[in-house]
Amino acid sequence: TSNRLMLRANVSPSTVTGIEVSGQDQPFGQNAYSRTSEQTYRDVAGTAQDTWSIGTSKVNEFRFQYARRGLSYFYNTQIPGGSDPAVNIPGFAYFGREPYSYIQRIETRYQFTDNFSLSVGRHNMKFGGDVNYLPLTATFTVNYGGVYDFGSFGAGSLGFVNPAPNSLPNFPDLSPVQSYGAGLPGSFVQGLGSPSDKFKNIPIGVFWQDS
């Protein structure tokens, strides 16, 4: 008999800043720097494998893997305005906190795999199994920072009614920029409640083959 042991480790960090998002009708080119976001990955993985040869006709392979992925998606933390409530002025400007931020997710994997190979006469058989345990936690705070939408605002909504519509022009409506200057949002959206959740997944697989 003989044994061969293999160990492997991987680390993969990544950080991307200045991301422009087009969700919720945000067109590229109209997002201010404060509306950009940043995404961070921190991936770590390790594997240990033992290959056990038993005589000339039997081989057992056992492998354990641990892997962890940490994901963070945040509003712009480089300037104070990145955490302010989001302001949408369609056709003109989008600034303040990115509505989809922040997101935090951690996925961990524990994997156990064992395969046994056996040669008997003209048959080469192999069977084994695989068990995974994957706990996951996630936080998703869409619109939790608050979103103000500014659009056109009718003059009639402010009490400006044309007393003689047949002879006098109507009062002009406020443009989205004028509505923002007047502090008159058309809507306000705010996410509420617990944004966090956690769950686990346990996939199990077995196989047998003969050739």
Task: State what each model feature region is.
Residues 1-211:
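Short acidic-glycine motifs
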